[in-house]
Amino acid sequence: FNNYPCGMVGYKFGAKASSTDEFYIKVIGKGGHAGLPHQTIDALSIGAKIVTAMESFMSRRIDPFDSAVFSVGIFESGSAINIVADSAKISGTIRCQKDETRAYILKNMEQIVNGLCQAYGATCKIDIIHGLPVQVNDAETTEYAKKVVEQAIGKEKTFEIPQPMMGAEDFSYYA
């Protein structure tokens, strides 16, 4: 998770690693022949709108200085070139540096997904798997660890990590 030289020890006060949550969205529409699109509810199109709406939400409703990432890793829909898709599956992760931002994104994601599905006549299922919390290093403990490491290997072999990473870390339960 880092590109720091071997033999160096980094420390970080405050937020060090992001929270991570998984999302699984299923859009249920009504498939049909591509020549009769008015008789269908195009789940693929609705799914695409969900992805672009979430990306727009992230860039316009989240403070740019408040690190947060919405990533779609899987988008599955359709089975033939001449058939309007009856379902779409969208899966990915949300990563944040603040608990308040995490809650805000998850709440609004549900509103966006439900709203778009309702607007286009589809139904949906949203599953959120809450993963790791934000790793926030205690200032007093970090200062103590920093001094111990500096005494052990020398101050010149230690450095303060400049910014938190957007990866998640199991160590968040201990920090």
Give the residues covered by each predicted segment.
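A short glycine-/small-residue-rich loop at the edge of a beta-strand within enzyme catalytic domains
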Residues: 38-41, 45, 96, 100-104, ...
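A conserved active-site cap/scaffold subdomain adjacent to cofactor or substrate pockets
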Residues: 81-106
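Short, hydrophobic beta-strand segments
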Residues: 25-27, 89-96, 126-130
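Histidine/acidic-residue-rich, glycine-tolerant segments that coordinate divalent metal ions
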Residues: 1-84, 168-169
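Divalent metal-coordination and catalytic microenvironments
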Residues: 33, 47, 92, 145, ...
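Short amphipathic alpha-helices in soluble, non-transmembrane regions
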Residues: 105-114
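An extended, acidic, His-containing surface patch that forms the Zn2+-binding/catalytic region
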Residues: 127-175
